[in-house]
């Protein structure tokens, strides 16, 4: 096979008809400015073609499930292998997905518990032994004399099928009745037709008898018969009582509880046989949250209880007011002008959760007269939960859900599994307790359990697989994660590194792996582990192409491909190719300029002092935070640093941001646990500039998000042509009927479903993709229609609106954040996370500064080349220069070295983290020997 991947004439997106030879079975880094064409080369050309060729080789039946990829714009690619992409998109948001299920480690743990787990009685905790038939019969005979019962053989449990042959066999064997899915049928009499696509439970009725003297022999024979047909199981059905399953396998002789044979599905929370029946295996239920109902305990009952009349109570008599006053009178509690926090706890509980059986005398006066009645009070929270369950209105359901939060299931306490499954242990721990440990602790535990020689032999292969997979996760710096952590709560970098570890576990060879910035969210300390993992993937015999900006990865790569020189139309060329040393010496390579030090981000000569005010988080205990108190000085550029999993996002996003958003903006999101957040009066607003999309549909774009499109529509509506035709600004909107093309409803494209090929979008034949109707497009400003303006890049628009300061200043900020290459009308769905974040930054920059705004950014350098980081630093410094405060969660040392104040958390990740290690200027942090950040920052300050 060819030793190289040879690309000829790549023209996808902004690529300039490039020819490129990439060595196979090597670690290759593709780098370049944001928007230069790296992803167009790696993902939209190489991955798309590798995937397309593989899918094309399958049958048309298989293709309809996979979706066909479009052929990229490239003349030819030789030497291409099947491609696997490991990108930044976070793993499933499905609440049933956990780190354990995504990595498949949980499947091995289920197998381990099914094979060598020891069951204990869920009631008395006694170790469960197997039962003999005599013990089972003795247990049944303890029922009162005269008790009627049925002896059933549970022959089918939760299996799909029609079972016609089996039912015929049971009839031939002399059985008269069967119970299917809870319903009785007579064999040979009733017509039995089962849906083969549904799961069924089938029990054969072996005997019906009454407990009396001399029945033992018959009962023993019936139990033996049932066990013969039902794999050592028998069910005893006593009318009006819970059915009992007895097994010759496992049962508690004291409590009469029997266990079925341990199987892996018993430990799966995604299977009805293992899942907690109350929460169906999710681990939590949505319930009305006391903290969301009473967000401010300094208010009185009259105006502090949300969703229960707080907004109307002040205006006069309401039912809610009458309830509160009648209950207060009954218990002799004064509530007028008394803050909720000073009310007796027991009284507040009665208001929130009801008075139980205690009857209250209520008196309600309205225009219709006075009405008296006596009844127990249901309670605010039960009332709202009942209304939520009963309402048929989606609007009301959404209203009640604003006051709900996830609360652990009361049956399983968040463990997701039924009590029988949680009663099986290996050593001292059940499967839930084991998965709640961090990955490195799990590895240590399973390697130190004492096993009998038989168990050791059974478990040998399973433990081998577990050790291998756990080690891969440790190797990519994820030792701090727990296997029970929901997959949806992982950051993009964590999710990507999990998939990377899973791929190494798969052990494939001859594959082309394409990764998108795997170093995101990873502290410099763990970079070596990640690089070793990438090399391991390469050494298995794979080609590894990484889109990356991290210096360490570049130096470790066999080859670097630098795409540039600029972004958008100014990019798309190969500027340099070779090792890091060769790139350094290539003129015209911006990457080479920064690697060699010819260009660099300068350390500020002096750091800003705080304005003397601060915000302080006191006693933070959410997730792994160890009751820490942290002060954020205002008027400074602050970086929160620390290794992955040390608690940075918990402190800044979960506690600080959500508390301020609740108190300043009235947000309903529940903040993380802390005693209090002080100093909120020192700021007037908080803005979280994250990487979530600026819109969910192709209709939203940078022009609409920044607000500049409104001004452009005003401009077009003010032209003479528009005035003559009587067009207002609404005419120039593609979202409402009037000026838009109705054939495509202003989308510019039509979706065509291709069934066994992927859906394709074709330009609308009526408007030719311009979104507007002919009449609207006839209105021109400086010779351009509204559609032409949307099609301009930011850079072109800047020149076009040069003489209109209002519009120019808005577009200028987009250019300043490095987005000169994107189009004003570019659909938001095509913007990367980093681009979306910079559109938000530009929008904030264009607003009037109050000097009292707190900005929060979580890893803003994601997807940014060092030259882009340089530009970002300048913008952030501009925002702070106007008196605002910026808090950034970051690992990028080039950005960290430019900030005024660092808060370093650690020392490790997970339960070994959550402490404040160092606080102060970068110069102060590097002197702290306990700080990993300080250790790596040192060389950046010199």
Model-derived features with residue positions:
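Conserved phosphate-binding elements of NTP-dependent enzyme cores
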Residues: 1-942
């Amino acid at each position: 096979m060819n030793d190289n991947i040879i690309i000829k004439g790549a023209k996808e997106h902004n690529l300039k008809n490039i020819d490129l030879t990439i060595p196979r079975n090597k670690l290759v880094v593709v780098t370049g400015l944001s928007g230069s064409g790296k992803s167009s080369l790696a993902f939209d050309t190489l991955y798309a073609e590798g995937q397309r060729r593989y899918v094309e080789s399958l049958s048309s039946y298989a293709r309809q499930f996979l979706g066909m990829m479009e052929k990229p714009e490239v003349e030819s690619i030789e030497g291409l292998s099947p491609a696997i992409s490991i990108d930044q998109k976070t793993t499933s948001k499905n609440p049933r997905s956990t780190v354990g299920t995504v990595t498949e480690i949980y499947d091995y743990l289920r197998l381990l518990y099914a094979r060598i787990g020891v069951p204990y009685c869920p009631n008395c905790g006694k170790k469960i032994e197997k039962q003999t038939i005599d013990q089972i019969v003795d247990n049944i005979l303890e029922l009162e004399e005269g008790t009627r019962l049925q002896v059933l053989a549970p022959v089918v449990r939760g299996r799909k099928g029609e079972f016609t042959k089996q039912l015929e066999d049971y009839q031939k064997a002399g059985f008269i009745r069967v119970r299917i899915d809870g319903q009785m049928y007579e064999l040979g009499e009733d017509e039995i037709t089962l849906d083969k696509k549904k799961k069924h439970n089938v029990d054969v009725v072996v005997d019906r008898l009454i407990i009396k003297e001399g029945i033992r022999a018959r009962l023993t024979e019936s139990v033996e018969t049932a066990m013969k047909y039902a794999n050592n199981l028998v069910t005893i059905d006593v009318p009006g009582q819970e059915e009992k399953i007895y097994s010759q396998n496992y049962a508690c002789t004291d409590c009469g509880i029997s266990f079925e044979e341990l199987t892996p599905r018993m430990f799966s929370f995604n299977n009805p046989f293992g899942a907690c029946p109350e929460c169906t295996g999710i681990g939590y239920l949505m319930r009305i949250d006391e903290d969301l109902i009473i967000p401010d305990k300094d208010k009185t009952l009259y105006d502090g209880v949300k969703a229960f009349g707080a907004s109307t109570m002040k205006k006069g008599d309401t039912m809610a007011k009458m309830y509160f006053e009648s209950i207060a009178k009954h218990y002799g509690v004064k509530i007028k002008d008394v803050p909720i926090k000073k009310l007796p706890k027991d009284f507040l509980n009665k208001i929130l959760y009801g008075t139980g059986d205690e009857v209250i005398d209520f008196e309600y006066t309205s225009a219709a007269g006075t009405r008296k009645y006596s009844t127990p009070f249901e309670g605010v929270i039960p009332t709202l939960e009942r209304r939520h369950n009963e309402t048929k209105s989606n609007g009301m359901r959404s209203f009640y859900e604003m006051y709900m939060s996830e609360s652990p299931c009361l049956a399983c306490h968040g463990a997701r599994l039924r009590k029988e499954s949680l009663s099986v242990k290996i050593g001292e721990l059940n499967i839930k307790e084991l998965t709640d440990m961090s990955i490195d602790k799990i590895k240590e535990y399973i390697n130190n359990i004492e096993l009998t020689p038989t168990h050791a032999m059974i478990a040998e292969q399973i433990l081998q697989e577990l050790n291998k997979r756990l080690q891969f996760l440790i190797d990519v710096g994820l030792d701090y994660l727990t296997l029970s952590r929901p997959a949806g709560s992982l950051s993009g970098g964590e999710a990507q590194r999990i998939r990377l570890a899973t791929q190494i576990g798969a052990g494939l060879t001859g594959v082309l792996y394409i990764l998108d910035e795997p170093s995101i969210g990873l502290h410099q300390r763990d970079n070596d582990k990640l690089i070793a993992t990438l090399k391991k993937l390469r050494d298995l015999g794979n080609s590894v192409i990484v889109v990356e900006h991290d210096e360490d990865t570049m130096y470790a790569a066999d080859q670097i491909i630098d795409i540039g020189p600029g972004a958008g139309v100014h990019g798309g060329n190969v500027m340099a190719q070779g090792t890091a040393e060769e790139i350094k010496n290539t003129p015209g390579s911006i990457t080479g300029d920064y690697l060699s030090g010819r260009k660099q981000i300068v350390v500020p000569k002096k750091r800003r002092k705080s304005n003397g005010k601060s915000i302080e988080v006191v006693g933070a205990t959410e997730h792994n935070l160890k009751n820490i108190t942290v002060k954020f000085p205002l008027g400074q550029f602050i970086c929160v640093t620390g290794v992955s999993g040390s608690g940075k996002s918990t402190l800044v996003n979960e506690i600080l941001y959500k508390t301020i958003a609740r108190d300043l903006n009235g947000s309903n999101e529940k903040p993380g646990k802390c005693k209090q957040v002080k100093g909120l009066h020192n700021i007037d607003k908080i803005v979280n500039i994250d990487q979530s999309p600026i819109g969910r549909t192709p209709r939203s774009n940078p022009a609409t998000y920044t607000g500049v499109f409104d001004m452009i529509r005003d401009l077009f509506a003010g032209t003479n042509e528009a005035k003559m035709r009587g067009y207002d600004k609404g005419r120039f909107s593609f979202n409402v009927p009037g000026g838009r093309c109705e054939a495509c409803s202003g989308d510019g494209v039509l979706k065509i479903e291709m069934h066994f090929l992927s859906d394709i979008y074709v330009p609308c034949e009526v408007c030719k993709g311009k979104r507007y109707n002919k009449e609207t497009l006839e209105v021109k400003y400086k010779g351009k229609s509204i559609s032409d303006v949307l099609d301009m890049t930011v850079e072109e628009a800047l020149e076009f609106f040069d003489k209109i300061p209002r519009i120019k200043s808005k577009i200028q900020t987009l250019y300043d954040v490095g987005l000169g290459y994107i189009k004003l009308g570019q659909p938001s769905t095509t913007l990367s996370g980093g681009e979306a974040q910079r559109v938000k930054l530009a929008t904030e920059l264009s607003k009037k500064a109050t000097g009292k705004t707190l900005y929060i950014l979580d890893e803003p350098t994601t997807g940014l080349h060092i030259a882009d980081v340089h530009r970002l630093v300048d913008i952030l410094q501009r925002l702070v220069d106007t008196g605002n405060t910026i808090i950034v969660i970051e690992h990028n040392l080039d950005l960290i070295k430019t900030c005024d104040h660092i808060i370093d958390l650690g020392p490790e990740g997970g339960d070994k983290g959550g402490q404040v290690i160092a606080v102060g200027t970068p110069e102060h942090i590097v002197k702290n020997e306990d700080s990993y950040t300080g250790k790596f920052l040192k060389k950046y300050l010199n």
